[in-house]
Amino acid sequence: MEKRNPREWLCLNRTVRFGETDAAGVVHFVELFRWCHETWEESLEKFGIVLKEIFPSTQINTSQLDVALPVVHCEANYFQPLYVGDTINIELYPEKINESSFVLLFKFKKNGEQIGTTNIKHVSINPITREKCALSKQINLWLHESGLNF
C-alpha cells in the first residue's frame, strides 16, 4: 500500500456562509460542531471509508451496523468571531483513548491564527445492546494512520 500523508484527509478549508451566522452577523456557536462532524466525515471518505458502513441512515437498518459511535462528551473554545466570507482551515487530530473510545481534536485557523478549538469524544457501542465494544477495524486503521507523520 502506498504511503499517504495524513494531511490529505485531516485538513479541510471552508468558507463561512450567511446561513451559518446569527443575528449579530457572526458564526452561531453550534456551527463549529457541525463543521467538526463534516470534517470528520470528509476525512473518513478521503481515507477510503464508506460512510454508510459507519453511520446509520434510512438506507441501512441500524441493527445491520456492527458498532455505533455516539458522542459522550464535547466542548469548544472560541477565541475570535467569524464572519460571512471568512475562509478557515480546520485541522483534525484524532486520538485513540482505548479499545472502545477515541477523541477528535479540532483546531480552527484563520490566516494561520488559531481562532477556536473543539474536542469530541466518541465511544464504540453495540447498536442493539448499547454496551461498549471494540472499535471497528476501519476506525482503528484510520486512527492509526492518522497519527503517523502529522
Curated annotation (Swiss-Prot):
UniProt entry tagged with the keyword Hydrolase: yes
EC number: 3.1.2.28
Short name of one Pfam family: 4HBT_2
Alphabetized Gene3D superfamilies for the sequence: Hotdog Thioesterase (3.10.129.10)
Cleavable signal peptide: none
Catalytic reaction(s) noted: 1,4-dihydroxy-2-naphthoyl-CoA + H2O = 1,4-dihydroxy-2-naphthoate + CoA + H(+)
InterPro entries: DHNA_CoA_hydrolase (IPR022829), HotDog_dom_sf (IPR029069)
Membrane-spanning segments: none
Enzyme class (EC, first level): hydrolase
Pathway: Cofactor biosynthesis; phylloquinone biosynthesis; Quinol/quinone metabolism; 1,4-dihydroxy-2-naphthoate biosynthesis; 1,4-dihydroxy-2-naphthoate from chorismate: step 7/7
Family according to the record: Belongs to the 4-hydroxybenzoyl-CoA thioesterase family. DHNA-CoA hydrolase subfamily.
Described function: Catalyzes the hydrolysis of 1,4-dihydroxy-2-naphthoyl-CoA (DHNA-CoA) to 1,4-dihydroxy-2-naphthoate (DHNA), a reaction involved in phylloquinone (vitamin K1) biosynthesis.
Protein name (record): 1,4-dihydroxy-2-naphthoyl-CoA hydrolase
